[in-house]
């Protein structure tokens, strides 16, 4: 596993500053895939959507997934911008296709930033030639930086494995910090893989990975207009019996990026990891874990290092999943709080100290507050991730457009 510059064979990445942000930071990225690449995408479930989301879905469907390039801008979401939004997306993708010498229908576009603000289209178009030239540099790092908005850190990962003596690489990069909620959290994420997989199989693999990762995170319960996860594969095909190994790799990449997004929640001090075990189904377990991660009362208790277990149980009860309180075991870290639904003897000061230590721990290593809920009603389990909710979150979002 690496967060360096290793990349899947045949793919090129670029990221530059095009003047779309006042900060002069990188704000325009491009991914170029080999010919005959296969693409799958999952997008926001909000009925209020940016035009680029609709265009992405239409082009993936119309081309049966034969996509060559993805243009990504940050700074303006280009959502709720009427005909301008559609025209700007179509104009930009057409220019990219001409510069790359490919079909316009093979180009997707994703945008992120302030809703209601049109793209600074002149700056974008004027800088496209430079962006295409930067593909020669082939920097995954630059692309990862260019899609960020309120993120504090970039989010990228590459993993390698060997199948039949062949090195296989899967890379991913993402953005997301605020407006994060399960079911395609407010985020953009892109995955590339240098193994060829048929469209139908690839759709299934992407859907499985997203269910266990991006659809299992929450920062603030808000869903965006621009959410997108796009995965592209290209390369020599492998025996189908090895597809499970590719699935495992995709799962690792997606979960790593999802946890990075949750940890980088606006104003967050720790990652919250909730494991639900002993459920009747994986789906039930994830729903309960999500409900706990999404509870503002749980998140503020975590921020205050308050082992308020009642909030955890209450959030689980609001999940819509049936379970018996008398069967429950609850742990915060290694401390058992409930045993068969009844309060267990524990030292609240030690639990609070555990939470405080995690709040100050090393980033994504020792800063994880773990909650485990054992339903003792089945054999399935599921995990969701979130973060604490701090005063800093309010400060950031009360001043976002000013």
Curated annotation (Swiss-Prot):
Record carries keyword Zinc: no
Site keyed Involved in the stabilization of negative charge on the oxyanion by the formation of the oxyanion hole: positions: 112-113
Annotated metabolic or biological route of this protein: Amino-acid biosynthesis; L-arginine biosynthesis; L-ornithine and N-acetyl-L-glutamate from L-glutamate and N(2)-acetyl-L-ornithine (cyclic): step 1/1; Amino-acid biosynthesis; L-arginine biosynthesis; N(2)-acetyl-L-ornithine from L-glutamate: step 1/4
Residues of the site described as Cleavage: 185-186
List of residues binding substrate: 149, 175, 186, 266, 397, 402
Active site: 186
InterPro entries cross-referenced by the UniProt entry: Arg_biosynth_ArgJ (IPR002813), ArgJ-like_dom_sf (IPR016117), ArgJ_beta_C (IPR042195)
Record EC number: 2.3.1.35, 2.3.1.1
Cited NCBIfam families: ArgJ, PRK05388.1
Subunit structure, interactors included: Heterotetramer of two alpha and two beta chains.
PANTHER family: ARGININE BIOSYNTHESIS BIFUNCTIONAL PROTEIN ARGJ, ARGININE BIOSYNTHESIS BIFUNCTIONAL PROTEIN ARGJ, MITOCHONDRIAL
Listed HAMAP family: ArgJ
Family affiliation: Belongs to the ArgJ family.
Protein name: Arginine biosynthesis bifunctional protein ArgJ
Annotated source species: Prochlorococcus marinus subsp. pastoris (strain CCMP1986 / NIES-2087 / MED4)
